[in-house]
Amino acid sequence: METAQFVRKSEWEWTLPASGEMKVPVVIYASEELLRAMDEKVREQAVNVAMLPGIQRASFAMPDAHWGYGFPIGGVAAFDADEGGVVSAGGVGFDISCGVRTLRTGLTRNEIGLALKPLADELSRAIPAGVGSTGRLHLSLPEMDRMLTMGARWAVKEGYGTESDLEHSEERGCMDGAEPDQVSEQAKRRQQDEMGTLGSGNHYLEVQEVKEIFDESIARIYGLRQGDIVVSIHCGSRGLGHQIGTDFLKKMVIAASRHGLVLPERELACAPIHSAMGSQYLGAMRAGINCALANRQILTYLTRKAFGTVFPGADLTLLYDVSHNTCKVEEHFVEGERKRLYVHRKGATRAFGPGHPEVPLAWREAGQPVLIGGSMGTCSYILAGTLESEGLAFSSAVHGAGRAMSRHQALHHWQGRQVVNDLAGRGILIRCRSMRGVAEEAPFAYKDVSAVVDAADAAGLARKIAKLAPVICVKG
């Protein structure tokens, strides 16, 4: 992307002033190198978002931004319903509530050293993964509705976790306002056999070593030490979330026309928040969030069982679970006025700072854990939300590395077996269902996650706490 079109506010903040139909400016947080590497389509999509009714402050893009459907991935936009604000299915994405949860194992790298292969094999057997993968659960439609209403609370009630898990999950494991009746039967049927599955693409379960600590005091609060082993699970709402997105994108095209909304791009199909369609989508999307929370909770149960088989007595405790494809109602300041806003985060992680009431009590003095996944074979990070992030981008931060090339392009550069062998040579065990999928997710198909995290830290979006190195990766 050409940088000359932006006003450089600081080393890490780039602004494109509002012009034409834009109601607010575009603000991108990135180093100059990351900004230049972004596709021009990111700027175009961020500008289009800035034209939507009721948008507040700016159309934001995170350091890992790349172009997506309608909104850029890594985009953040907040809307005031009382100023004609809209909700957009494209602003949430197809994988509703895709997110990461990280578990502390109580084990160290030295303690698991001789059991890496048995652990990798046991996790591969225990965790259903891959395109169209099915789990060991089959939910009736009435049971599906209960899950969509209760989220991870349903899973815990069914014996797949503990109250402590809920306490350390975003929304305490249950998104209020879910309306299963707004989810199509087709979406529900797609999910009946998919609970407790990873799926494919960039989703994974990864056993990781805490390789480096950047902030000892917060790491101590989070219960992290160098050499510790943690497990991170990255997945979302599977087929149900995708179907909700598909269903409502079609409906919103019609709704936008009916409400006289002039859209700069059809992919930005949206509906006024104060409309029947806006309300219906929010109810369905919240049900999708609950599906993802329940799915990650069941995967946690399966992970605990697998660890217990190899390491009897292992006690895996949840650090945090946070999503990065959502639209949430939150209170934020806009020009000194406290407003109730609908914050779209698409490929962006909520990052509440110290003292925020939504942060679990155990972590409140430190700020919310912000879990950042790298690409396969590269490091991941644990960050903490900051107080200044609220004023920067509505308490939002990055979500991962961000793609540097398409999956199709990646297939022309790498073969799956080659990637698996290369990573094995570095001591990283890969267990996968598809060699094609491994090639599509090759490490160099993504941006440098360390550069992305450094930019987020330097800009004040979130604070670096710990660096995680992969040991075992289970992929679809």
Please state what every model-predicted region is:
Residues R101-T105, R109-D121:
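A glycine-rich phosphate/pyrophosphate-binding beta-strand-loop-alpha-helix module
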